[in-house]
């Protein structure tokens, strides 16, 4: 940390911490990563686990409980700069987690022969899109592991570190990720806004990011039917199955500043 600070370039010091960095015990003592003299922030594995769990069927209420636990424990500067992701070089790729069988200790020969296709692949890509919509709209900095944007698959090392598939024709996720990135760039609420949960039950997540100038509202629908969800403004919006809606309004203004609805 001292070496990073000595550069005088505004650099930050982050490390890979697999658990809640404020409650982690290691080598028989509690770690002090985020008490002001250690790390600036961390890789946000708890968010990864919560989001993947939700799109795989976990109850929205428990998912949001896990997310809010991190939001409450981390200092604001650490939370706003935590690295949010779904895949890494040390974990199974997100699409594999979502659409394929758990490895359950099976060896590399079994893992090397796995590739999800057909209906399982199609459903997996829809769930992956939902998962990235959440990752891009939660507190923290969204990170895209190479290949997720084209649905690359793979269990643990070395299968999660395969060469990029330049021949892939999978293009559906790229424009969604590009628009989510642009929305995050233009809407200050996604960078430093407070998180407020409006609904988290069953297969529906509904939350706000409240900034100084804008308020963003995010509804994610994991269910198999269209839902009509009331907005904080008093309006209603439809959210398609396996889809999400993002509404951004300027504070003190009506109508909407921006509106996104992916079907």
Each predicted region: which residue ranges?
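Aromatic/acidic polysaccharide-binding cleft in carbohydrate-active enzymes
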Residues: 26-28, 84-116, 132-170
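Conserved, function-defining core regions and hallmark residues within catalytic/recognition domains
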Residues: 172-193
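Active-site-proximal helices and loops of the catalytic beta/alpha 8
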Residues: 1, 6-82, 153-179
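Carbohydrate-binding surface patches
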Residues: 198-231
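Short, solvent-exposed loop/turn segments at secondary-structure junctions
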Residues: 18-21, 88-92, 149-152, 222-225, ...
